[in-house]
Amino acid sequence: AGIVLDKLSFAIANWNRSQACTKTKQLLSKFNTNIELILANNDEMAIGAIQALTETGIAKEQWPIVIGIDGTEDGLEQVKEGNMIGTVYNDGIKQADAIADLSIALAKNESLDSFNLKNGRYIRSPYQKVTIENVDDYLKLLQ
């Protein structure tokens, strides 16, 4: 099931747009248009990859699919412009609410059963897929 991919390479860009741009240019010089997909662990690095694609003059229709994570305003704008196929929204508000609720429960020495802690320690706040179809909804959340 799914699509079989060959991993051509990887690069570490330390969550940094500029480093991601440099690393992507290096990968493009090595693999040219054989790169079909760029998965970045945050939107900043995805945007750095987009910057490299733009600066190297590759025609947009030849770009690989670019996906980021975090759903930052800049990342959402890249999705809206069609430069990234998607990002994954990291809901900081839900995370903050969960931390506050947990802190209050701990301070009051209340049961933590309702928090459904994973491994007795973690609260999972699900990420949300953002694509061109729903990007405007997420941009509104950031206003």
Spans of model-derived segments:
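Hinge/beta->alpha junction and helix N-cap segments in small-molecule ligand-binding domains
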Residues: 1-23, 39-45, 69-74, 90-98
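Short helix-capping segments at alpha-helix termini
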Residues: 1-4, 30-33, 54-62
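Short, well-structured alpha-helical segments in soluble
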Residues: 18-34
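Venus flytrap/periplasmic-binding-protein-like
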Residues: 39-42, 47-85
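Extracellular/periplasmic ligand-binding modules, especially the Venus flytrap/periplasmic-binding
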Residues: 42-50, 80, 92-108, 128
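Hinge/cleft segment of the Venus flytrap/periplasmic-binding protein
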Residues: 97-143
